[in-house]
Structures are given as C-alpha cells and as structure tokens.
C-alpha cells in the first residue's frame, strides 16, 4: 500500500502587524472628545465639515485641539488623525473618507455616522476585555468575529459593512438618497 500523501501548502499568514488593546484604546480615547463634540455642538460640527470640505488642515487641527490635547501626527485626505505607536515609524490612524472621493461632507450625514459609532468608541475606551476581543479579531483578520462584536453597538439603518483591515477596522455607511458612502476607519499607517 503505497499511499501518496498530498503535499500540504503552508498557511499564508495575513500581512497584519499585531496591534495591542492598549494602542487601540489610546487611539480611541484620543479621538473620543472630538466625536463627542461633533454630536454635542452643532456649531462645532458645522465648522468641522466646512474645514474638511475646503481642505483647511490648519482649521481642522485648531478645531481638534480645542477638544483633545492629544498630539496629532497626521491629518490626511478626508480627515484622519494619526497617533504615534511603540512600533517604529508606524501611526495608528482614525478618520473618515467619503466615496465618491469628489463628494462633499454634509453636516447631517456626518452627524448621523458619528452618532452611530459613538457607542462603539465609548465601549472600546472603557471596557478592556471588549477591546481585547476586538483586537484579537483584528489581529487574526477575522471579519466575521469583528462583525459579531461591533454590529450590535452600531444602531444605524445606514450601516453597510464592517471589515478587519490593515491591523484595524473599517465601518462603512451608505446614504441611499445621496448615494455617498462614509467610511470610518481605525488602522495602522506609516508615519
């Protein structure tokens, strides 16, 4: 009996770098005052959307620094805040982008999305075991597990997708009338 053994192909590891619950929580805690202010203060929210739509990074940084004293390492397209990590030349980034890219943010749609993600961010900031489970799902690239952890905290009929990506996650919302897709992300970037 000469049975041929099938050659086992090596399991391809995902390209994610491992992110820790501490890095995730620190990033979320740094942006949480900003998102709270967007929800709490209509004038601040309108000023923010105006700065984003006119690509006024100086005004965006000024507005962010009014509510969070966290140092910003990057402000990118759409908008994003990059925070240093212990990993050399790596930032953990949180922000939004809009698809199609040439679209303009509206105060109302932006507010709806921020209100939807706020419960998730509050939980990540305050619940270490939850942040640990989310981080484990991110590090393993397990989008199904990540969905089951996050989806119950985001109560919005506009929620489109939740994905593990780049040692972080992307949460997308679609507004049917405008056909715009707002994507909130927290992921590892280059600094």
PLM feature segments, named:
Residues 2-191:
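C-terminal-biased regions
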């Amino acid at each position: 009996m000469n049975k041929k053994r099938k050659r086992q192909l090596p399991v391809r590891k995902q390209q994610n770098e491992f992110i820790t619950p501490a890095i995730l929580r620190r990033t979320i805690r740094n942006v949480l005052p900003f998102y709270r202010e967007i929800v709490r203060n209509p004038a601040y929210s309108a000023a923010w959307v105006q700065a984003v739509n006119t690509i006024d990074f100086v005004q965006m940084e000024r507005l962010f620094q009014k509510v969070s004293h966290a140092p910003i390492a990057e402000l990118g397209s759409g908008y994003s805040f990059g925070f240093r990590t212990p990993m050399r030349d790596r930032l953990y980034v949180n922000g939004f982008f809009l698809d199609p890219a040439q679209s303009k943010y509206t105060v109302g749609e932006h507010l709806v999305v921020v209100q939807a993600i706020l419960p998730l961010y509050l939980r990540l900031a305050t619940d270490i075991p939850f942040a640990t489970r989310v981080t484990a799902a991110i590090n393993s690239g397990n989008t199904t597990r990540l969905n089951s952890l996050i989806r119950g905290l985001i109560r919005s009929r506009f929620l489109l997708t939740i994905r593990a990506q780049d040692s972080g996650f992307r949460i997308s919302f679609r507004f049917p009338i405008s056909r715009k897709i707002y994507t909130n992300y927290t992921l590892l970037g280059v600094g």
